[in-house]
From Swiss-Prot:
Disulfide bridge positions per record: none
Principal cellular location given in the protein's record: cytoplasm
Domain of life: Bacteria
PANTHER family from the UniProt entry: RIBOSOME MATURATION FACTOR RIMM
Keyword list, A-Z: Chaperone, Cytoplasm, Ribosome biogenesis, rRNA processing
InterPro entries for this protein: PRC_barrel-like_sf (IPR011033), PRC_RimM (IPR056792), RimM (IPR011961), RimM_N (IPR002676), RimM_N_sf (IPR036976), Transl_B-barrel_sf (IPR009000)
Annotated Gene Ontology cellular component terms: cytoplasm; ribosome
Presence of keyword Protease: no
Function statement: An accessory protein needed during the final step in the assembly of 30S ribosomal subunit, possibly for assembly of the head region. Essential for efficient processing of 16S rRNA. May be needed both before and after RbfA during the maturation of 16S rRNA. It has affinity for free ribosomal 30S subunits but not for 70S ribosomes.
Subcellular location: Cytoplasm
Name used for this protein in its record: Ribosome maturation factor RimM
One of the GO biological process terms: ribosomal small subunit biogenesis
GO terms of molecular function: ribosome binding
Length: 182
């Protein structure tokens, strides 16, 4: 595989997916997309992977659906052994490639690390992850060490207007209407 270190390595890397196991003997790999529409992962190029702490650009040659999976063929990955070396590599792009969002919409990456405070001023903790459920996204909040309720982690639905009262990315804070006991 022709892996090349590039001067255009992502400045603000964001993970869009992950390469899975190899498929067949000609260098195809399963791909798992983290984008809202799974096929949207192919709209963002170039892709980067990180091997031994170094960014490497990879070129998508082809992709297709196979049963319930999507499989990809990367340029220079021509056999099963080469494909196996890429198993579990994260697919990364620079965040500058992502489209600008409308007011009130947020990328999950921008919410990570935000401090979450109730409308009454109680500090719930910091956002450490997001979950997608069938009906709405959910903030996963790591509670402060000395949480008065002894809670280590909270799940708060991201319901704009109902639960989420204010998001301020400048101050990295989210105000919520939420009972700290939950």
């Amino acid at each position: 595989m022709s892996k090349q270190l590039t001067a255009q390595a992502p400045v603000d890397p964001i993970v869009l997916g992950k390469m899975g196991s190899s498929y067949g003997i000609r260098g195809w790999l399963r791909v798992f997309s983290s984008t809202e529409d799974a096929e949207s992962i192919f709209d963002y190029q170039p892709w980067f992977i990180q091997k031994a702490g170094q960014w490497q650009q990879v070129q998508l040659e082809s992709w297709k659906h196979h049963n319930q999976d999507m499989i990809i063929k990367l340029k220079g990955v021509d056999d099963r052994d080469a494909a196996n070396l890429l198993t579990n590599c994260e697919i990364v792009v620079d965040s500058s490639q992502l489209p600008q969002l409308e007011e009130g919409d947020y990328y999950w990456k921008d919410l990570m690390g935000c401090q979450v405070v109730t409308t009454e001023g109680y500090d719930l903790g910091k956002v450490i992850d997001m979950m997608e459920t069938g009906s709405n996204d959910v903030l996963v909040i790591k509670a402060n060490l000395k949480d008065a309720f002894g809670i280590k982690e909270r799940l708060v639905p991201f319901l704009d207007g109902q639960v989420i009262k204010k998001v301020d990315l400048t101050t990295r804070s989210i105000e919520v209407d939420w009972d700290p006991g939950f």
